[in-house]
Each structure stands twice: as C-alpha cells, then as structure tokens.
Amino acid sequence: GLMGEKYAYAQGEHPLTAKAISEHYLPKNADDELPLTFEGLVLSIADKMDTIVGCFAAGIEPTGSQDPYALRRQAAGICSMIIGRGVLVSLKALIAQAIDHYPAEIVGDAEGLAEKVYAFFEQRIRNILNDQGYRYDVIEAVVACGYDNLTETVLRAAAVVKVKNTDTFGQLLNAFTRANNLAKKA
C-alpha cells in the first residue's frame, strides 16, 4: 500500500513500480477509485485473483452472509477494474494463470477449480449490470451468451438495450417466434 510505495521510493525502485505498489489495494470498495497506472491495474488484478483462486483451492468459499476473506468484494474489484478501464481480457485466462502458479497438490482438479471460480464471477457481473440499471431480461440474455470478456459483456448489454427499443427488434422477435412455433410442430 502507501507505506510500500514510500519504501520502494526510498530503496530506489522505479517510480512506476512504487506507484503500482500503492495502487495494488485499489479498489477497496465499490465506490473507490481504480488504479491509474497500467502496472497498478495489473498488480491489483493479479493479487485479487490469486487470493480468490487460493481460497477456493483451499476450500474457503463465501456462503450466504459468510465471506471472511472478502472474496466477493475482491471479485467485484476485478470486474470494476476490467470494465472501468475497458480492458479486453479473458476472465478464464486470468483464472487459469492464477491456478498455474499453485502446486498441483494444492489445486487438485484444476479444471473443476477453474469452473468454480468462473461461476463465482457470474453473480458479480450480474450485480454490476443490475447496478448500471439494466433490466433482468437484458442481464439474462447477455450472461447466457457468456461473460468471459467482461468489457464486451457490458457493451453487449448496451447494444441489446439499443436494439431492443427499435421497431426492427419487434419485427425480428415476431419472425423468430413464428419460425420457432413452426419448428415445434414439425
């Protein structure tokens, strides 16, 4: 954090390294600022993903009101940083990279762990879309198409809303409904 930045400067570290050290705890909550530097952004995402993967690998997962390691907040922070900075990155690749840094005996079933962590992020992206004012049906539609790239998922939601409010959408929906009904009868 802040003291780490001061120590890094005192030890002659590059200014970007020192700044990344101070930014790696950001965001601390939903309304907090995001890291300003690319280095701080990468370090913060990596640190939070490492914590989430490590906890899931150890069998420590949030349940109901229990989240002693603030994993939901850390996942929401990852989502906020990726979306807020418009980063085009694969969530699955970030998870896989974090898993690769753990010994096999800790990870166990790496594929199963990756799926569990990926599914954990689904509710975070749903919450973000809901907080941005998207309706339930729009959220369902865009999440059903996948959310591996969080920035694209939010852009997809905006595009669905834009298209949904046009006459063409109604015509396409009617045509699809007719074709779907005919296919059921065949």
Where are these regions (language model features)?
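Amphipathic alpha-helical "coupling" segments that flank catalytic cores
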Residues: G1-A186
